[in-house]
Each structure stands twice: as structure tokens, then as C-alpha cells.
Amino acid sequence: SIHGDDANDGTENQPLKSLYAVNRLKLQPGDQVLLERGSVFENQFLHLNVQGTKEQPIYIGAYGNGAKPLIQTNGQGIWYQDYGNELDAPTHVYRGYVSSAVLLYDCEYLTVENLEISNEGGVFGETYSAPHKMNRTGVAGIAKNRGTLHEIHLSNLYIHDVEGNVYDKHMNNGGIYFTCLKPEAEDKKVLNVSRIR
């Protein structure tokens, strides 16, 4: 929140300031994270590994008046993507670093709405078609170690200027990109995302 402080407890009357503080929260079923409208989270990102329930989903949204809260990541929020196996052709990149403004890692029963998201590439002077340009996403969804994931709702998001690598079509690149990765205990997991809206 533009009126927050990371020393606060994150309640309505004592909001946090940065997404770094939000990323440290241990969100539980039924919890809400509301970002103040008019806030700009420059060079920040929202990376979550949370699970709500059907009865008590977790909600990420906005409050107040004015423009949608803007998460302007600019190539930050870097994580390592690894499918776990080579893909159908040896030239296809199957692992590497990705910058994601919003990362939903093994999340379920979660709603994210009413946000503006960008992840520009020009910050580091990368040209549009640079062959080793950073892979970027606005929203990345990953299913890996929790089996079937249920009900991820993305609504009223304005995602723009996500400038990733135009060649790595199998990596998380684009406005919204969901991927199933090889789980750590592959023999015990069946990966599926049952419902995305």
C-alpha cells in the first residue's frame, strides 16, 4: 500500500507497504490480500505457494478508489523453471531462469483479480529479438508437487508489456502461462489443473 509500512501487521488499519512483506505471509484458507488502488509496486513481484479450500478460497485483489494496483516487475521476481526431462526436440529449452510478476506455485482455490501487471524487458537494454533474453511472464502458474490443483480464478487483470524471449516457446513466456513440471516424487503424483477461469 502507498500508505503502508512493512513494520505493520498487515491488517486493514495497519497495511503493509511492499510485496516483499506479502510474500513472507503464511496465508491460510479464507485469507485476503488487498492492494491499495493507486499503488505502484516498482521492481516488485508477488510469488505465492498457498492453498485455500473450496469453502474458504484465498483472495488477492484491490481496495480503495482510483487506478488498479500496478505490479511493475521489470525483470525481477526470478525463479528457476525445470520440466525435469528434455522435451520433444533437443533444441527446445526445458530449463532456465524466468521472471514472473505473479507466480502461483502449486496454488489452488485462489482468486487473483483487479490488478495491473507488467514485466518490461527494456530496463536491461535487451532488444526485442535478443537470443538470450530473459523469459518473462505476467502471471505464471506451476503445478509440480501437489497433484491435481483446483479452481484458480484470474479476473479483470490488465496485463501488458510482458517482454520475454520470443524464441523459448516452451518456457514460461507471455501474459499468462500455466505449466505442469515433473514432480519430485513422480511415481506418487498425477499432475493436473482442474479448473482455470
What are these regions (language model features)?
Residues 25-28, 36, 118, 160:
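Structured segments of extracytoplasmic/periplasmic soluble domains
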Residues 30-31, 39:
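Surface-exposed loop/turn positions
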Residues 34, 49-128, 163, 167:
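Right-handed parallel beta-helix/beta-spiral solenoid domain characteristic of secreted/periplasmic
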Residues 125-144, 161-186:
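Asp-box/WD-like beta-propeller blade repeats and closely related beta-sheet repeat scaffolds
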Residues 20-26, 41-52, 70-74:
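Short, T/G/N/S-enriched strand-turn elements that build extracellular solenoid repeat scaffolds
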Residues 57, 61-66, 108-119, 147-163, ...:
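Right-handed parallel beta-helix
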Residues 44, 58, 100, 137, ...:
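Extracytoplasmic/periplasmic beta-strand context in beta-sandwich domains
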Residues 1-20, 37-39, 67:
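Right-handed parallel beta-helix/beta-solenoid
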